[in-house]
Amino acid sequence: QKDFTALIFNDLHKHIPTLDALYGQVRDIPYDFVVFNGDCIDDPANEKEALYHLAYLCGKVGASHVPAFFLRGNHEIRNAYSIGLRALFDYVGDKTYGAFNWGDTRFVMLDCGEDKPDSTWVYYGLNDFTGLRKDQVNFLSKELSGKEFKQASKRVLLNHIPIYGNGDAYEPCPELWGSLLAKAPFNVNISAHTHQYAFHPKGSLGNN
């Protein structure tokens, strides 16, 4: 299957009317799969709240018969049930980052972690997203040199916090992953987080 349609939602922040309005624009368009690109089930306080919003998202897009992929945003990492939220998802490769093929297209998904340093006082020394990002250096290196990536006719990079064009003072992802991504022949990088539309042409921000 070379031609397909995917729906990508992000930064819903548990605001059901936003999802309803967005889905209303595409409800009559046949689609093959759905991606929730972070900050959709944010700041989960408990299992009941998390399950309610997960069920609503899946029900709205028909995830009983259409695959739905969930990427973690920085807000899914916060609040009392954030550690339990992980158990509600069947991640590709059982990690919060990974890759998969859809037809002749290769999708690579990265977990950018938090948008603040691990040393930020509100984390009380419990976070190690620096380690998570370093783990993904090894993942990326293997993925980009792998057969499935090289043989794909199109390649899509998905991540929540923009690797290019974010503008935050704290940008660890470009520092760690930039040299690998600079040589990677992705056709498009789709990110989220900023709550505003932006298009950055190839090469305009060091993006390949």
Where is each model-derived feature located?
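Flexible, glycine-rich surface segments
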Residues: 159-175, 184-186
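Short acidic, glycine-rich surface-loop motifs adjacent to enzyme active sites
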Residues: 41, 144-166
